């Protein structure tokens, strides 16, 4: 992988991580288009550059995070099922699911259909306008939804936003909770993967990781702000249809 390829993947990560469209699917597809082989380092790179996206959320929500204990209670409640399931299924995810093209295609298309239906449901039944109004048991259930995102192509943000809407959060608040829940979830996943890999990267690989990190950070800052403004006057259905389209494109590249 070259430096400019790391920049492109960093931009793709920053755009797709917090939108309900699957960052994993987009990174795999982009890497294929760029001619990047899906080596162990590339797999670790795709996970590690998520730290840049995490930092963007920390920067944007820093004041709220250090002052609002009620939000942290809900983040922790939602993280519990995700942490347990992610830890138990790490080897399966790393060894089989990551790189399985059929799994990604099915996840993208099925996830798009579910997102469309969930958004329609939310038009009538989403009534909570603040994360602090969310009961802890419902926060836990959102974490269960997030656990499904261990399957490549599902989308962590997509599953948590869908879970949030089904638990009664309006679109904007569901998206915000998804952003906040990303902090412990993505940090844990990235750290665990780096420990498992032994951090055994050479100087060139570390340089590529840093470039991807910085690029994803800057891109995510812009995308998070844009997405929240978008949700003030738009639904999520467009992302559902986009997932179906990109799933078909992915299938054309990898399955036919």
From Swiss-Prot:
InterPro entries: UppP. One of its GO terms (cellular component) is plasma membrane. The keyword Repressor does not apply. Keywords: Antibiotic resistance, Cell inner membrane, Cell membrane, Cell shape, Cell wall biogenesis/degradation, Hydrolase, Membrane, Peptidoglycan synthesis, Transmembrane, Transmembrane helix. It catalyses: di-trans,octa-cis-undecaprenyl diphosphate + H2O = di-trans,octa-cis-undecaprenyl phosphate + phosphate + H(+). It is found in: Cell inner membrane. The chain crosses the membrane at residues 8-28, 41-61, 75-95, 96-116, 175-195, 208-228, 236-256. It comes from the Bacteria. Pfam families: BacA. It is a multi-pass membrane protein. This is Undecaprenyl-diphosphatase. The lineage of its organism: Bacteria, Pseudomonadati, Aquificota, Aquificia, Aquificales. The gene is uppP.
């Amino acid at each position: 992988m070259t430096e400019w390829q790391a920049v492109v993947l960093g931009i793709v990560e920053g755009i797709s991580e917090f939108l309900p469209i699957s960052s994993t699917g987009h990174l795999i597809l982009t890497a294929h288009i760029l001619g990047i082989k899906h080596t162990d380092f590339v797999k670790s790179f795709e996970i590690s550059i998520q730290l840049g996206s995490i930092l963007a959320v920390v920067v944007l929500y820093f004041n709220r995070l250090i002052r609002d204990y009620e939000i942290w209670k809900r983040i922790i409640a939602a993280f519990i099922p995700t942490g347990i399931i992610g830890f138990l299924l790490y080897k399966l995810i790393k060894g089989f699911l990551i790189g399985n093209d059929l799994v990604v295609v099915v996840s993208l298309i099925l996830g798009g259909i579910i997102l469309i239906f969930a958004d329609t449901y939310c038009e009538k039944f989403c009534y909570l306008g603040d994360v602090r109004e969310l009961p802890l048991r419902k926060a836990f259930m959102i974490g269960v939804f997030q656990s499904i995102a261990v399957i490549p192509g599902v989308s962590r943000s997509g599953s948590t936003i869908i879970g949030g809407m089904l638990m009664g959060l309006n679109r904007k608040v569901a998206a915000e909770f998804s952003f906040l829940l990303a902090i412990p979830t993505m940090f844990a996943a990235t750290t665990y993967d780096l420990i498992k890999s032994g951090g055994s990267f050479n100087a060139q690989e570390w340089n590529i990781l840093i470039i991807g990190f910085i690029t994803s950070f800057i891109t995510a800052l812009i995308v998070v702000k844009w997405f929240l403004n978008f949700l003030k006057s738009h639904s999520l259905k467009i992302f559902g249809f986009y997932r179906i389209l990109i799933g078909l494109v992915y299938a054309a590249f990898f399955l036919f």
